[in-house]
């Protein structure tokens, strides 16, 4: 096994994915503290209590939604939830014990014992697969390239997953304004709803659709190259999400949300910014996940929380220059 493949197998270890999952809530909490701290540092002392309270509600609602989003999406779509660390350790222990009982202790025993509860190094993985690929594949299953026929289930899961933090951000933002902006809160609702629609369509849903369409075309053309699949899905994301999503979100906001729901005929255009275009890290995660790289999955709550946060503060190309909220981009 080459060093590059060994590193890839290292990242594919189910125990690694489960450990990353375990640390996502504290990472989100720490990130929220940084956002609140930086915002309060830039806010006049007389406004800090109000700004801190509003941000706390928005971020709290967004983070809780993001943490529970995988289970909600799995419940709706029927997709299997990720295994917990304890379940993986138990399965690995049974697998190793069965192997040792059948073949006895040998040169792989030390590595196999370690694999029960811990991470194997790339060098240990290389030794394991060179000596016994069968047991290696059972402990570290190879990534599965999702076929076109299964793509809609995966896209459905990703799209619901992304919708939950955005909805949480909107709800948190409205609640925060309702508490701290008693007279003006209703006027701020349209921006939150429209930004939520923009974030969801341009940065999540249509990006997933674009990746899925591209994957379907590649399957139809019988193109198996992982590099070609990756490039194709990125192209689909750029065309449908970054470009098409922005146009569709603006149309819905100006023709439906503002005039019909909020009785406001004012039209505004939310344009993609440089950071919107360059920091589509959640799309990288989408491509990776659709390519079978499960270790990227734990990062989704963090990435989708960014969209939820921006929806919660009603970010609209910073049209309010007095806003002190940090402009995190998705």
What does each model-found stretch correspond to?
Residues 1-330:
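Glycine-rich, hydrophobic membrane-spanning regions of integral membrane proteins that mediate transport
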């Amino acid at each position: 096994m080459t060093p590059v493949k060994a590193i890839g197998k290292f990242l594919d270890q189910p125990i690694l994915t489960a450990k990353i999952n375990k640390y996502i809530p504290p990472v989100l909490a720490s990130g929220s503290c940084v956002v609140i701290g930086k915002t309060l540092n830039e806010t006049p002392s007389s406004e800090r209590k109000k700004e801190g309270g509003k941000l706390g509600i928005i971020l709290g609602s967004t983070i809780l939604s993001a943490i529970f989003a995988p289970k909600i999406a799995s419940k709706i779509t029927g997709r299997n939830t990720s295994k917990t660390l304890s379940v993986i350790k138990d399965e690995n222990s049974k697998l190793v014990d069965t192997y040792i009982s059948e073949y006895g202790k040998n040169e792989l025993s030390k590595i196999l014992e370690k694999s029960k509860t811990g991470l194997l190094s790339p060098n240990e993985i290389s030794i394991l697969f060179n000596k016994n690929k069968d047991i290696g594949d059972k402990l570290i299953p190879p990534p599965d390239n999702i076929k076109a026929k299964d793509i809609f289930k995966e896209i459905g899961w990703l799209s619901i997953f992304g919708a939950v933090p955005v909805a949480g951000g909107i709800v948190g933002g409205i609640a925060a304004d309702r508490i701290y902006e008693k007279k003006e809160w209703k006027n701020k609702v349209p921006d939150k709803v429209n930004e939520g629609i923009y974030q969801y369509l341009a940065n999540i849903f249509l990006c997933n659709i674009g990746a899925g369409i591209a994957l379907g075309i590649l399957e139809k053309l019988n193109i198996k190259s992982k590099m070609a699949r990756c490039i194709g899905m990125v192209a689909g994301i750029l065309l449908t999400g970054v470009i098409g999503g922005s146009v569709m979100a603006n149309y819905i906001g100006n023709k439906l949300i503002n005039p019909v729901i909020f009785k406001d005929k004012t039209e505004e255009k939310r344009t993609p910014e440089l950071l919107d275009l360059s920091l589509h890290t959640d799309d990288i995660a989408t491509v990776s996940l659709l390519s079978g790289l499960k270790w990227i999955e734990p990062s989704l709550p963090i990435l989708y929380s960014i969209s939820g946060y921006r929806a919660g503060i009603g970010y609209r190309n910073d049209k309010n220059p007095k806003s002190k909220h940090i402009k995190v981009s998705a």
